[in-house]
Swiss-Prot record:
Keywords: Hydrolase. It comes from Lawsonia intracellularis (strain PHE/MN1-00). The gene is folE2. One of its GO terms (molecular function) is GTP cyclohydrolase I activity. This is GTP cyclohydrolase FolE2. NCBIfam families: PRK13674.1-1.
Length: 258
């Protein structure tokens, strides 16, 4: 059969990235405490395309992914990227896994156990077989306004906030290490299951540790800069203000060039 994709491009523009998006794929990922966690990822895959080809071979992306049967980490992702480059005969390749990562969390007072999910993304891109890894995660937390607490006779405004972390990694690190690092930098973590005694504890503990978004982003950055295998990072904290119709945010970037 005639292979139309392999004919020369009619317009002489090379394509930076072409491929498939939104592939659902079951994965395993190593946890610190409970071994392998099974979850479902959304996978994006892409390669560059020269002017010598009108189109890429879309089915080959799916073939490569179907043949890949390893727990997700930087080392296995590197092998997948290189195999994609080889199969698609490309100079550059990009693969990203978007997935929910689950932790068992105990309520602070009753010790009741429940699952809590975090949105994560592990991606890799290659340029002439040099590989760069990026781990991204979103950690929801609670923040209490220090100013509101200082000027009010009773209470202070509090709200749910989100911490967005992007990390340039030299090698894979346990995701929960970064989750704990982020949660400990805010006024309080969040929980799926809280009884009344737990609600009392969380409220009082959060009000004992008021934080601006500026405090949270600085706390996290000061910890990340000491972590081995983290080559650079971006951290943004966004607070969904309970007394305003707008949000507050703070952002720090350190040696994050990609």
């Amino acid at each position: 059969m005639k292979d139309i994709q392999s004919t020369p491009a009619q317009i002489a523009f090379p394509i930076d990235r072409v491929g498939v998006k939104g592939l659902k794929f079951p994965i395993q990922i190593q946890t610190r405490d409970i071994g392998m966690q099974h979850t479902v990822a959304i996978v994006d895959m892409g390669v560059d395309l020269s002017v010598s080809s009108r189109g890429t071979h879309m089915s080959r992306f799916v073939e490569v992914l179907q043949d890949w049967n390893e727990p997700l980490c930087c080392e296995s992702l590197e092998r997948l990227v290189k195999q994609t480059q080889k199969k698609l005969q490309s100079q550059h390749a990009y693969i990203a896994f978007f997935f929910p990562y689950f932790l068992h969390k105990r309520a602070p007072s009753t010790n009741m156990l429940s699952l809590f999910s975090y949105d994560c993304k592990l991606s890799a891109k290659s340029i002439n077989y040099n590989i760069e890894f990026i781990l991204e995660l979103t950690v929801p937390v609670m923040t209490v306004c220090p100013c509101s607490k200082a000027i009010s006779h009773e209470g202070a405004h509090s709200q749910r906030s989100e911490i967005y972390i992007q990390l340039r990694l030299e090698q894979f690190r346990f995701i929960e290490d970064f989750i704990v690092l982020a949660e400990s930098s805010a006024s309080s973590p969040l929980y799926s299951l809280l009884k009344r005694a737990d609600e009392k504890y969380v409220t009082e503990d959060a009000f004992a540790h008021p934080k601006f978004v500026e405090d949270v982003v600085r706390n996290i950055s000061s910890k990340l800069i000491t972590v081995t295998d983290v080559l650079g990072f971006r951290v943004e904290v966004e607070s969904f203000e309970s007394i305003h119709a707008h949000n507050a945010f703070a952002y720090i970037e350190h040696e994050f060039i990609c």
